[in-house]
């Protein structure tokens, strides 16, 4: 006789769906969201924290998708590379890194240039300005005189025109220590694509490898001139400021600590079988990355990966249960690589399906994105009745929120709400239980206090809703499930194990969001009741 279909636990991550009581420029509050509104009213819910020390970041630092999914999947607060690298600069240990010292020696020995490439930003999501300044100090300390800074401007995790202030800070540090020059500026739209849009990456690559003098303008003046044309930091056209092309004999330090948007440019420079566009492999070329972007990359790594064991996916696999992951291109690495603690390979019994994101310049042009296809894929997997855990991500609130387009963000939120309704129907038919949450805020704050577009993440909490299924009841609770109101992302994995009745490993230090059976709301405390 065939096994009975499995009623799954489904974790739905609404990427960038934060909570903010104020409705001004709040795309989530303004949008028509009957599904989420009804769930918030009818089912156990709470708010959880997604930023700062609650996710292993410095106090007050906004969370992001990488950090969020890493914490969710690990079931513990994971110390982040931002803190790890900043500490190494502040205590001076980075200046004694054998990897960096060897690179400096190789460059000097060949009479080459040292190129510093990365996101020039104080956003702290992919990189940090203090890390670049620390590398300039490293070059001076080790007597590397020919140093080229290739500034990738942000405008996505920061204010759209904050780049000029960052550039001026870099130039001030260069002037102070007498080492380095800003050779190029380029928006992250080109240099940090992660969706295999090789035409964009090629423009950045060509800028870095084709030399020239520039036209005499400073880097800050170039940015100001672009601003006057309504071209903001993210979209700064690849522009040469001063001589300093990457040539044989040179060395590169790519100082982004987050891998997903650094990989493609690194592939172009280092992989012999690269086929994204035609180019000649530059050799010899010493190439160092701050963190491991991809184990296949033939580069040296300064900060080796931290080992995370007994994470959620691993626990599920060890129990012989099957799991499924799906998202569209923009968030696929997050439900796979990051959710699995930085492991590329799936666990045994872990199936994945990637949905292609729309090929548009910016997602406000297609705010529905691929949410319908993600829903179709998740429903098809759920109906198979073979998965105990399904993890999925709706990218719309975050990706459209990053555009700063309020109207499009509202459309994105409404699209996700419609898809959520259809998804719940599929899960309900299987008797499964649903956990609905987010990895960080974004779309709830689309303008700053002065009315300017806000394209970055926020430090706001996010909703967490538990929709209990008929065939996947919370053990021992009956109809009286109560959620804690002091949770964080690291508590989600223990909650899932709680529902699946699986033991929680000792090094998974998060705590289930479900209060113990028999919890008396009246005599202990009253959970926070907030309406969206």
From Swiss-Prot:
GTP-binding is among the record's keywords: no
Pathway: Carbohydrate degradation; glycolysis; pyruvate from D-glyceraldehyde 3-phosphate: step 3/5
Cofactors (names): Mn(2+)
GO biological process assignments: glucose catabolic process; glycolytic process
Assigned keywords, A-Z: Glycolysis, Isomerase, Manganese, Metal-binding
Membrane found in the keyword field: no
Active-site residues from the entry: 65 (phosphoserine intermediate)
Residues at which Mn(2+) 1 binds: 398, 402, 457
Cofactor binding note: Binds 2 manganese ions per subunit.
InterPro entries: Alkaline_phosphatase_core_sf (IPR017850), BPG-indep_PGM_N (IPR011258), Metalloenzyme (IPR006124), PGAM_B_sf (IPR036646), Pgm_bpd_ind (IPR005995)
EC numbers on record: 5.4.2.12
Gene3D superfamilies: Alkaline Phosphatase, subunit A (3.40.720.10), BPG-independent phosphoglycerate mutase, domain B (3.40.1450.10)
Molecular functions per Gene Ontology: manganese ion binding; phosphoglycerate mutase activity
Positions that bind Mn(2+) 2: 15, 65, 439-440
One of the Pfam families matching this protein, by short name: iPGM_N
Catalytic activity entry: (2R)-2-phosphoglycerate = (2R)-3-phosphoglycerate
GO cellular component term, pick one: cytosol
The protein's role, per its UniProt record: Catalyzes the interconversion of 2-phosphoglycerate and 3-phosphoglycerate.
Protein name: 2,3-bisphosphoglycerate-independent phosphoglycerate mutase
Top-level taxonomy: Bacteria, Bacillati, Cyanobacteriota, Cyanophyceae, Oscillatoriophycideae
Gene (name only): gpmI
């Amino acid at each position: 006789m065939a096994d009975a279909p499995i009623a799954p636990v489904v974790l739905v991550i609404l990427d960038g769906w934060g909570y903010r009581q104020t409705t001004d420029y709040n795309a989530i509050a303004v949008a028509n969201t009957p599904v989420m509104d009804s769930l918030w009213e009818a089912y156990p819910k709470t708010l959880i924290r997604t930023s700062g020390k609650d996710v292993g970041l410095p106090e007050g630092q906004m969370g992001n998708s990488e950090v969020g999914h890493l914490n969710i999947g690990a079931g513990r607060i994971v110390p982040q590379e931002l803190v790890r690298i900043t500490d190494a600069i502040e205590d001076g240990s980075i200046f004694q890194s054998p990897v960096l010292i060897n690179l400096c020696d190789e460059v000097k020995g060949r009479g080459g240039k040292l190129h510093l490439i990365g996101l020039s930003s104080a956003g702290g999501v992919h990189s940090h300005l203090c890390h670049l300044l620390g590398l300039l100090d490293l070059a001076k300390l080790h007597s590397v005189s020919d140093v080229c800074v290739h500034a990738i401007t942000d405008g996505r995790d920061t204010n759209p025109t904050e780049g000029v202030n960052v550039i001026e800070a870099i130039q001030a540090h260069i002037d102070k220590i007498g080492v380095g020059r800003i050779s190029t500026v380029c928006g992250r739209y080109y240099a940090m694509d992660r969706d295999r849009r090789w035409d964009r990456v090629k423009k950045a690559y060509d800028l870095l490898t084709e030399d020239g003098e520039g036209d005499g303008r400073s880097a800050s003046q170039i940015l100001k001139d672009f601003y006057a044309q309504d071209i903001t930091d993210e979209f700064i056209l690849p522009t040469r400021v001063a001589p300093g092309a990457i040539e044989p004999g040179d060395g590169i330090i790519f100082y982004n600590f987050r891998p997903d948007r650094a990989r493609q440019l690194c592939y172009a420079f280092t992989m012999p079988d690269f086929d994204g566009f035609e180019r000649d492999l530059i050799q010899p070329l010493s190439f160092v990355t701050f963190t491991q972007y991809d184990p296949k990359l033939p580069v040296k790594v300064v900060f080796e990966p931290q080992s995370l064991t007994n994470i959620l996916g691993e626990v599920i696999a060890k129990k012989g249960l099957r799991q499924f992951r799906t998202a569209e291109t923009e968030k696929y690495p997050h439900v796979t690589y990051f959710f699995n603690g930085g492991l590329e390979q799936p666990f045994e019994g872990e199936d994945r399906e990637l949905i292609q994101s729309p090929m548009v310049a910016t997602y406000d042009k297609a705010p529905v994105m691929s949410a319908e296809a993600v829903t179709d894929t998740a429903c098809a997997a759920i109906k198979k009745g073979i998965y105990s855990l399904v993890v999925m991500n709706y990218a719309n609130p975050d990706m459209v929120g990053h555009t700063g387009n309020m109207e499009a963000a509202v459309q994105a939120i409404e699209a996700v709400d419609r898809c959520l309704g259809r998804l719940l129907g599929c899960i309900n038919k299987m008797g499964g239980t649903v956990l609905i949450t987010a990895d960080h805020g974004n779309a709830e704050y689309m303008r700053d206090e002065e009315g300017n577009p806000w394209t970055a993440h926020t430090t706001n909490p996010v909703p967490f809703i538990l929709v209990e299924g008929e065939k996947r009841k919370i053990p021992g609770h009956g109809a009286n499930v109560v959620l804690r109101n002091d949770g964080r992302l690291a508590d989600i994995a223990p909650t899932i194990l709680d529902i699946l009745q699986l033991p929680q490993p000792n090094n998974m230090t998060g705590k289930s969001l479900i209060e113990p059976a028999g919890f008396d709301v009246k005599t202990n405390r009253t959970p926070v009741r907030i309406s969206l």
